A protein has these predicted regions:
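All-alpha prenyltransferase/terpene-synthase fold signal
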Residues: 1-215
């Protein structure tokens, strides 16, 4: 999990995480990539100690899927025709898959022969992970940088559509849609409060909360 966050900070060029400077801010992106790789390899070394190929298989597949999620999200940057299916897919691969694999590996280790137990815990954790990502996207439009522990609206400035923006865009009239698309990926300085107010006004937060509750 830590490795994915370190790499995610490099991809997003995030200066802070949990209220402190990121590795790439303190040093360079190269440091972030190498330290992330080091942590990944350490995780696999620890898993090898369990001598369980099923756990190793799950961990390696999850690592591959998480990278896939980052690539899918990068491919959606700047696109204004992103669907809810696209967003759920990214949430699953980037976050849900990590939750799912973590729970599944623990379940395999604890009750290897109980397939129903393993599957139920895996599915629960998958949906919990997707819900976590939806909540994280919602908080980006609800809290300030200090409360969030990282810069707010960073996805928006990078041209990444998240749930609140998606729903607001879907509900917008021609004038509001023009404004929303003008700030997507824009390097111009806009007041965060103005953007958040517009997203709220268009039902972006409310509909995201409704989606969150469905998970």
């Amino acid at each position: 999990h830590t490795a994915t966050l370190v790499h995610d900070d490099v991809v997003d060029e995030s200066p802070t995480r949990r209220g402190i400077d990121t590795i790439n801010k303190n040093w360079t992106n190269s440091h972030g990539i190498l330290i992330g790789d080091f942590i990944y390899s350490k995780a696999f070394m620890l898993m090898i100690g369990l001598s369980d190929m099923e756990i190793l298989d799950e961990l390696s597949k999850a690592t591959n899927d998480i990278s896939k999620g980052e690539l899918i999200q990068l491919g959606l940057i700047g696109k204004n025709d992103v669907s809810i299916h696209d967003l759920i897919k990214v949430s699953y691969f980037k976050t849900g898959r990590l939750f799912e694999a973590s729970a599944k590996c623990g379940a395999i280790f604890a009750k290897k022969d109980n397939k129903t137990y393993i599957n139920n815990l895996s599915n629960f954790s998958k949906y919990l992970g997707i819900a976590f990502q939806i909540k994280d996207d919602m908080l980006d439009y609800s809290l300030n940088s200090k409360q969030l522990g990282k810069p707010t609206l960073q996805d928006l400035s990078e041209g990444k559509i998240t749930y609140p923006f998606y729903f607001a865009l879907k509900n917008a009239n021609v004038k509001d849609k023009k404004f929303l698309l003008s700030i997507l990926g824009s390097k111009k300085h806009y007041k965060n409060s103005k953007i958040i107010e517009k997203i709220e006004l268009l039902g972006g937060i409310k509909q995201t909360e409704k989606l969150l509750k469905s998970y």
